[in-house]
A protein has these predicted regions:
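Post-HEXXH active-site segment of zinc metalloproteases
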Residues: 25-39, 69-73
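Conserved donor-binding loop and adjoining core beta-sheet/short helix segment
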Residues: 1-12, 31, 35
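Short, functional N-terminal and low-complexity linear motifs
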Residues: 2-5, 18-25
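Short, conserved acidic/polar surface loops in the N-terminal third of protein domains
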Residues: 12-15, 25, 45-50
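Non-catalytic, topology-defining segments of multipass membrane proteins
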Residues: 1-8, 40-174
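Active-site recognition of the HExxH zinc-binding catalytic motif
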Residues: 13-22, 53-57
């Protein structure tokens, strides 16, 4: 069951991803509506992700300005700490730990704190485009869209909590 629902949800996520790239329809209103509905149902803040993903494509492989999956540099303190830790526990154990951490914590950490982003932007938050988080990723003209994304995800979370209260947490987790 989990494989079937995960595959279906991934398919919906891919359609929303295409909407975020502007590849779903020649009508912007349609692709933003479809993308917003699908991503929001999957607890992804559509417009926030649309913006950060565009920056990711514009700055891929840039060691300071990259938006996601920016490696720690050996010439910086956090990179030296990472290398020392990897050396201490071994390459295989470090790889297993890194993969586990990315799969369990990576997406929420990225959305809430800009984890894996480049150092030039500071900590960002896909739900809160203003202080105390860095606002470079979401210029003022994006704020209304970020707040719309936040509201949508909040509504879906509230519906899930209400469903869990009514039907039980197990029933909601089995969706």
């Amino acid at each position: 069951y989990a494989i079937a629902t995960g595959t279906a949800a991934t398919g919906l996520w891919v359609v929303a991803h295409a909407c975020g790239h502007g590849a779903f329809s020649r009508h912007g209103w349609l692709q933003n509506t479809v993308g917003y509905v699908l991503h929001t149902a999957l607890l992804v803040p559509y417009f926030s992700w649309q913006r950060s993903h565009a920056v990711h494509h514009a700055r891929t492989n840039h060691l300071d300005e990259g938006e996601t999956h920016v490696p720690r540099r050996a010439d910086r303190t956090n990179g030296q700490t990472t290398l020392a830790f990897r050396s201490r526990i071994g390459g295989a154990a470090y790889a297993a730990l890194t993969i586990t951490k990315a799969l369990l914590l990576g997406w929420p950490a990225y959305l809430l704190a800009g984890a894996t982003g480049g150092p030039s932007r500071g900590r960002t938050n896909h739900f809160w485009p203003v202080r105390p988080f860095a606002s470079d990723l979401f210029p003022r003209r994006w704020h209304a869209r970020v707040w719309a994304s936040t509201a949508g995800v909040a509504v879906v979370l509230a519906a899930l909590v209400a469903a869990a209260a009514h039907f039980g947490p197990g029933a909601v987790l089995a969706l």
